[in-house]
From Swiss-Prot:
InterPro entries: AAA+_ATPase (IPR003593), ATPase_AAA_core (IPR003959), Clp_ATPase_C (IPR019489), Clp_N_dom_sf (IPR036628), Clp_R_dom (IPR004176), ClpA/B (IPR001270), ClpA/B_CS1 (IPR018368), ClpA/B_CS2 (IPR028299). One of its GO terms (cellular component) is cytoplasm. SMART domains: AAA, ClpB_D2-small. Residues 1-145 form the Clp R domain. The keyword Nucleotide-binding applies. Keywords: ATP-binding, Chaperone, Coiled coil, Cytoplasm, Nucleotide-binding, Repeat, Stress response. Residues 158-339 are annotated as: NBD1. Its main location: cytoplasm. This is Chaperone protein ClpB. One of its GO terms (molecular function) is ATP binding. Belongs to the ClpA/ClpB family. It comes from Chlamydia caviae (strain ATCC VR-813 / DSM 19441 / 03DC25 / GPIC). It is found in: Cytoplasm. Gene3D superfamilies: 1.10.8.60, Clp, N-terminal domain, P-loop containing nucleotide triphosphate hydrolases.
Length: 864
């Protein structure tokens, strides 16, 4: 028998394997029946399931019959088909012939079983009380005019059920989230669906704005009956592309599956609507070696109006795939779905709040909803509302839920303290001296007291957990009751509606209110079950690295004394330190301009006066590590084409996919200090890029992605006018002001930088040449760093004033600033100490002092 469907052929093969493994000499019709029932995707199984909702009853009867089959002890010869199985297959072949089918399939086998009266099938058949004529009608209804003309034809029946999800059924079962707002878009979708031809809306919008939610909203309205007469009673299916492609082994199998779905939608005469999410994936799908792609299968049905279809795709994909295919584009009516306003996004979150509260078992405050929208809008610019705000609420709620299930911090601390005391007591008990025994007895009292405190805390924890868990269960019950009320109203069961609306629901709501009040009135609660704006800010900070949560007292104090902290590292530059500190304080309390970077500063001055050091010190203070500073040496950007290094190569060039060094650094770490060293050496094209960043806080990279630069601090350093500045300061001494210094360098500045560039800089900060006092302070800072490194080897280093004076005199050169000091300390001090350490002259746990003797550095050990 050569023309058998794939499903029947597979069942026959498995039947032979089953008989062989059970050592049965013959493959009976029961082996075959068992294997047919195991394939839950087969036509045979689907019809059995339609006849009787529980096919397991038949499976159990077949298993019992198989246990009575004879078996042979020796020999493993291949079992032969029994006369009963051969007769059954011949009958099935005749059924296929009668129905005009080319291939024998599962429905033919079922008809043959039905007529054979073989046990245990015959006994099961009596329980279902269905006639042969009714069975044939059911098969015709399932097949919907399809012929078995290929081995896989059987698999393509009921395409809608296999490869689609019924959204209206999910809405009826209450499994969809409520769709708030978007009334205009849903109304427009309904309007297009009501047309006679080309009734296919295409939802186009950015990812996360709510395109899929519009389809779900339509399904909810169909169930509620809030829909025009032309769409009442329709079924909305969403195409599952994964299921459609998965397991399509042979060429043309994917197209067959899609055709079966389209045929099912068309055969019900407009009663089904197909929703294709990410519709652009159909363009090109299945097209190999000149074959048609899946989109071409859609076109005829779309043009005729026999296929009701809703598509959804993003603006970029629509442009890239759909617009290129003019024939496909004109068969859809575009509906643009824009990002909701901040007010609408808050409104949407209010509608979803209850679902998330019930799922996580927490309370979400109004402030949390507002914070989620505002903070996501400001700090997560590369995603869209309401999706990003919903994600914030979801993550914050899951954080609280996780904390409820974990051990509270006070209990954890007490348990650690108790464990440490017990270990210490056990160690003391081993000592024989009476004083130790007394101490062990005293510790026992502390242990008992801690155990009592722990027991009380655990009792409180259990009570709070019980209250919170009970609240979650009651809220779940309330949601189920409200769904039951809606369902009863749909089927006009008004007695049930009245009972739920006026009795059960109000009583449960009152219980929930009482439980919430009882929970709120508890003092010193161990568990937090409220999602507030503080927690939302914490989640945003975790996502972006931008510290927008409320400042701790320690951080506030640190910001107030920022100048003092910076002056410990950068000496003699009060103008720059003061201006930068003010900018950071304004940004940290949220008073800086939200549409511009935190600060844009140009540091002017001769080499070695602390320009780069100040940028490093800022990064260290803000992020606790100097490496957090993103540094660009602008001598690498002197050619016109080098701008592509910053924002990425244009399309078609090597490195296009990698992105630019500046754009990628700011995308990964938006809150950072960006240093452009020696900015005057950069090409003019680089300055044009910086204009956009400094003015709007936005950088557009080579892929047209907008990178947020509003949380970065930009510092540029330059040596422009350093000679004029040095001459002026030498003439005037310490009596210079910032304004007078800038007036000296202004003419030189205008030669290098355009007026529009200078205009976008927040402040131009002159770094004046260092005087003798500054050099002495810098030597002290550098020496303390050497001493710090020695402390790691348990060596204490001190020095007298003569060492500082010698180093400051020998190491300072007004032309080179403080940089030669570092080299001198390396040559004179570090070299001397490293040789002494290698020789063993300096050992661990010693103190040494550096002194001068006839212009020679010496060290001596300090006894004691």
């Amino acid at each position: 028998m050569d023309k058998i469907s794939d499903a029947v052929s597979e069942a026959l093969e498995k039947a032979f394997e089953l008989a062989q493994s059970a050592k049965n000499p013959y493959v009976s019709e029961n082996h075959f029946l068992k294997c047919l029932l195991e394939n839950t995707e087969s036509l045979f199984y689907l019809i059995i399931k339609d006849i009787h909702n529980n096919p397991k009853l038949l499976t159990s009867a077949v298993d019992e019959a198989l246990s009575l089959e004879p078996s042979v002890i020796e020999g493993s010869a291949m079992p032969k088909p029994s006369p009963g199985l051969q007769s059954l297959l011949l009958d099935a072949k005749q059924e296929a012939k009668d129905l005009g089918d080319e291939y024998l399939s599962g429905d033919h086998v079922l008809l043959a079983f039905w007529k054979s009266n073989k046990e245990p099938f015959a006994s099961w058949k009596k329980t279902v009380k269905i006639s042969l004529d009714d069975l044939k009608k059911l098969i015709i209804n399932i097949r919907r005019g399809n012929r078995m003309d290929s081995p896989s034809a059987e698999n393509n029946l009921r395409g809608l059920e296999k490869y689609c999800k019924n959204l209206t059924l999910l809405a009826k079962e209450g499994k969809l989230d409520p769709v708030i707002g978007r009334d205009e878009e849903i109304r427009r979708t309904v309007q297009v669906l009501s047309r006679r031809t080309k009734n296919n809306p295409m939802l186009i919008g950015e990812p996360g704005v709510g395109k899929t939610a519009i389809a779900e909203g339509l399904a909810l309205r169909i169930v509620q009956g809030d829909i025009p007469e032309s769409l009442k009673g329709k079924q909305l299916y969403v195409l599952d592309m994964g299921a459609l492609i998965a397991g399509a082994k042979y060429r043309g199998e994917f197209e067959e599956r899609l055709k079966s779905v389209l045929k099912d939608v068309e055969s019900v005469d407009g009663e089904s609507i197909l929703f294709i999410d990410e519709v652009h994936t159909l363009v090109g799908a299945g097209a190999t070696d000149g074959a048609m792609d899946a989109a071409n299968l859609l076109k005829p049905a779309l043009a005729r109006g026999t296929l009701h279809c809703i598509g959804a795709t993003t603006l970029n994909e629509y442009q890239k795939y759909i617009e290129k295919d003019a024939a496909l584009e004109r068969r859809f009516q575009p509906i643009f779905v824009t990002e909701p306003s901040l007010e609408d996004a808050v409104f949407i979150l209010r509608g979803l709040r209850e679902k998330y509260e019930i799922f996580h078992g927490v309370r979400i405050t109004e402030g949390a909803l507002n914070a989620a929208v505002l903070l996501s809008y400001r700090y997560i610019p590369d995603r869209f509302l309401p999706d990003k705000a919903i994600d914030l609420i979801d993550e914050a709620a899951s954080l609280i839920r996780m904390q409820i299930g974990s051990l509270p911090l006070p209990i954890d601390e007490k348990e650690r303290e108790l464990a440490a005391l017990i270990v210490k007591q056990e160690a003391i008990k081993r000592e024989k001296a009476p004083s130790y025994q007394e101490e062990a007895a005293a510790m026992q009292q502390s242990i008992e007291q801690l155990k009592e405190e722990l027991a009380a805390l655990r009792l409180r924890w259990d009570e709070e957990k019980k209250l919170i868990t009970g609240l979650k269960e009651k809220k779940n019950s309330l949601e189920n009751m409200k769904f039951s009320e809606e369902e009863a109203e749909r089927v006009a069961d008004y007695n049930r509606v009245a009972e739920l609306r006026y009795s059960l629901i109000p009583a449960l709501e009152e219980e929930i209110r009482e439980d919430e009040e009882a929970l709120n009135q508890r003092d010193n609660r161990l568990l937090q079950e409220e999602v507030d704006e503080r927690l939302i800010a914490q989640v945003v900070a975790n996502w972006t690295g931008i510290p927008i949560q409320k400042m701790l007292e320690g951080e506030a104090e640190k910001l107030l004394v920022l100048e003092e902290s910076l002056e410990e590292r950068v000496v003699g530059q009060p103008f720059a330190i003061s201006a930068v500190s003010d900018s950071i304080r304004a940004a940290r309390v949220g008073l800086s301009d939200p549409q511009r970077p935190l600060g844009v500063f140009l540091f002017l001055g001769p080499t070695g006066v602390g320009k780069t050091e100040l940028a490093k010190a800022l990064a260290d203070l803000l992020f606790n590590k100097e490496e957090a500073m993103v540094r660009f040496d602008m001598t690498e950007y002197m050619e016109k084409h080098s701008v592509s290094k910053l924002i990425g190569s244009p399309p078609g060039y090597v490195g296009y996919e990698e992105g630019g060094s500046l754009s990628e650094a700011l995308r990964r770490r938006p809150y950072s200090v960006v240093l452009f060293d020696e900015i005057e050496k950069a090409d003019k094209e680089v300055f044009n890029i910086l204009l956009q960043i400094f003015d709007e806080g936005i950088l557009t990279d080579s892929k047209k992605r907008k990178v947020n630069c509003k949380n970065a601090l930009f510092i540029m350093t330059s040596n422009i006018g350093s000679q004029e500045l040095a001459d002026y300061c030498a003439k005037k001494g310490s009596r210079v002001s910032k304004e007078t210094v800038l007036s000296v360098v202004a003419p030189t500045l205008k030669k290098y930088f355009s007026p529009e560039f200078i205009n976008r800089i927040d402040d131009i900060l002159p770094f004046v040449p260092l005087n003798t006092e500054d050099i002495v302070k810098i030597v002290g800072i550098q020496m303390r760093r050497v001493a710090q490194r020695l402390l790691e080897r348990r060596v204490t280093l001190t020095w007298d004033d003569s060492v500082i004076l010698y180093l400051s005199e020998q190491g300072y050169d007004s032309s080179f600033g403080a940089r030669p000091l570092k080299r001198l300390i390396q040559q004179k001090v570090v070299t001397l100490l490293s040789k002494a350490l290698l020789k063993g002259d300096i050992k661990s746990d010693t103190s040494i002092e550096l002194t001068m003797s006839k212009d020679v550095l010496l060290f001596k050990k300090i006894e004691g």
